[in-house]
Amino acid sequence: MLPIENSTAGSVNKVYDLMMQHDFHIVRTTRVKIDHNLLAKPGTTVEQIHDVYSHEQAINQCAGFIERMGLTPHVVENTAMAAKSVADSDRTDVAALSSRACAQLYGLDVLMRDVQDRDDNYTRFACISKPLEVYPGADRTSLMIVVDHRPGTLFKVLAKFYALDINIIKLESRPIPGRDFEFMFYFDVECPVTAPEFRTLMATIGDACEECRYLGSYSEVL
């Protein structure tokens, strides 16, 4: 399971890049409510805190809180590592943005609860697989599409979806490695994998683009 998108901070682009590099496929997605807490060593007060450590996504999701508190953010690999680094530190002016479970695991105090900027803070996680697996009920598909670097080429791709009445629920660009200021496009589309429209799309999309990579069809588990 890997985080691919957050309702506050947007896409986790590094995960998409890793999927492309290692040829993984999405087989399921699910949404999880995410709460962040300010953790520090026992006996530390909020007023003592100057520096806060966490994953980049957690820092982005708590950006307003960090600014209001006048804290200096530091990015680490994940929220659990942030909690451990605070627990292992000799300093009493550092804190972590992490879970209450990590507070218990590493013997930290919860100075403030639920400090994310939005109460409705959800992260979408993808279950990925090296071999391609499509399970019954799959009604969403992720694609990576590269178009020629000239006017109208992206429009031709979008026209394919429009002509087949396939809803695009997400569209984002990412730089193409080794090609300055050229971009690939990630699409999430809403269409049952068994629908004739989907089969037509996959059979003809290559006519409108330079490259189309199929990242998987899946359903979202709520």
Please state what every model-predicted region is.
Residues 1-222:
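Domain-level signature for soluble enzymes in the chorismate/prephenate branch of the shikimate pathway
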